[in-house]
Amino acid sequence: GSTSKEIINEFSKVVSVLNHGYVIHNQAVSLMKSSHVLINFLFNQSGYSTMISGKLIEYMATGNPVLVIGDLNSEVSDLMKISPNSSICLSNDTKSIKDYILKMYNLWIEDKLESKLPVGIEKYTRKFTSKELCNILKAMPK
């Protein structure tokens, strides 16, 4: 995916931002794992439930803290509860966003920012969900 220049410019006002642009998947996973905090923006379409993206699952699977900007009443919000040091904030809640980033920054400065795999994240992997789908299809009457 891509990130708009406006978003990069806004974040650059308060934190150091390094935009790698489009990279191949293996490099993307490596960059995710090497990051201290990952930020995921949820597409918000009124009247529709926010879907849980593969990208968010990949972010969570790194064990690194994840800040999600999106709907607090979505399935994503429920999923975020299993991810230690992670948070979800509304896009207009700049105080909560700032507080979260500052908290993660202070943990990083104190060398206390830890990666912790969310308990149960493996059930959201492509491998696991594909296996579950196969089991459902096999159980269907022919």
For the regions a protein language model found, what residue spans apply to each?
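Membrane-embedded alpha-helical bundles of multi-pass transporters/translocases
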Residues: 1-2, 23, 32, 40, ...
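Nucleotide-activated donor-binding/catalytic signature segment of Leloir-type glycosyltransferases, i.e.
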Residues: 4-29
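Acidic donor-binding loop of glycosyltransferase active sites
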Residues: 16-17, 32-50
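Short alpha-helical segment that forms part of, or immediately flanks, the ligand-binding pocket
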Residues: 29, 54-64, 77-78
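Short hydrophobic beta-strand element within catalytic cores of glycosyltransferases
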Residues: 37-40, 58-70
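A charged, aromatic-enriched C-terminal amphipathic alpha-helix characteristic of glycosyltransferases
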Residues: 92-96, 109-139
